[in-house]
């Protein structure tokens, strides 16, 4: 079975169509105002129409309150909510009860103990995403999409009960090695398919998906 691929931070019909044509398994859309990939609700609603029903839509938010999540769900009609902040297991329980959607919780990794955090979400998250934790010294760092790679050996022997996805600085050149070291069955990419902040290209998308599927 080939590695599953999530393309995150999409913002144009062209890149959505390129992702679908190349075989993306998930399409991600960002709702976080500090991100260059942030979407207005109006644009998200329009872009949603370009996504086939067979490809799950993922809405990424960061410590969003109910009012914001209501607006995101109304605009995008996502299949999955990706929670990329400091949301607690109890907050996930509340979100699940309110929307009934699949929940993906990001776990940011920099130290050996960080992957162990996944255990506290065992009963509340449907999916996990291991991403690179930005250093405190990094000016303007985002919760994700910084192009940072973490030490993949930190999760090489880590097998959480919850299905998981690998993220953090992946690109067409390093994704095969990342999969080999971690054993990841699914990968997530954003900055690694951009020619500039938030500017994805069909060519980079296709190259990444091709490399990931061959890994």
Swiss-Prot record:
| Enzyme superclass (EC) | isomerase
Q: Which domain of life is it from?
A: Bacteria
A Gene Ontology biological process in which this protein takes part is: L-tryptophan biosynthetic process
> Catalytic activity, per the record?
N-(5-phospho-beta-D-ribosyl)anthranilate = 1-(2-carboxyphenylamino)-1-deoxy-D-ribulose 5-phosphate
> Does the entry feature the keyword Amino-acid biosynthesis, yes or no?
yes
Keyword Acetylation attached: no
Q: Name one Pfam family in it.
A: PRAI
E.C. code: 5.3.1.24
GO molecular function annotations of the record:
phosphoribosylanthranilate isomerase activity
Q: Which UniProt keywords apply?
A: Amino-acid biosynthesis, Aromatic amino acid biosynthesis, Isomerase, Tryptophan biosynthesis
UniProt-listed InterPro entries: Aldolase_TIM (IPR013785), PRAI_dom (IPR001240), RibuloseP-bd_barrel (IPR011060), TrpF_fam (IPR044643)
Which pathway does the database say it acts in?
A: Amino-acid biosynthesis; L-tryptophan biosynthesis; L-tryptophan from chorismate: step 3/5
Name the NCBIfam families for this protein.
Answer: PRK01222.1-1
- So what family is this one in? Belongs to the TrpF family.
Please identify the protein, giving its name as recorded: N-(5'-phosphoribosyl)anthranilate isomerase
């Amino acid at each position: 079975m080939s590695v599953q691929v999530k393309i995150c931070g999409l913002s144009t019909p062209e890149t959505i169509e390129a992702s679908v044509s190349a075989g993306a398994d998930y399409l991600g859309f960002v709702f976080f105002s500090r991100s260059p990939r942030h979407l207005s609700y109006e644009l998200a609603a329009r872009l949603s129409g370009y996504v086939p029903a067979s490809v799950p839509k993922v809405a990424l938010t960061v410590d969003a309150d109910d009012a914001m999540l209501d607006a995101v769900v109304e605009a995008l009609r996502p299949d999955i909510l990706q929670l990329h902040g400091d949301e607690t297991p109890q907050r996930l329980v509340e979100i699940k009860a309110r929307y009934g959607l699949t929940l993906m919780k990001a776990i940011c990794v920099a130290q050996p103990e960080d992957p162990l955090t996944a255990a506290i979400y065992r009963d509340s998250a449907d999916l996990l995403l291991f991403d690179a934790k930005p250093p405190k010294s990094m000016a303007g760092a985002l919760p994700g999409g910084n192009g940072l790679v973490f030490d993949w050996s930190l999760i090489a022997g880590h097998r959480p009960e919850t299905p998981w996805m690998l993220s953090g600085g992946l690109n067409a050149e390093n994704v095969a090695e990342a999969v080999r070291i971690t054993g990841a069955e699914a990968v997530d990419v954003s900055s690694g398919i951009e020619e500039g902040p938030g500017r994805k290209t069909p060519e980079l998308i296709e190259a990444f998906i091709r490399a990931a599927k061959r890994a």
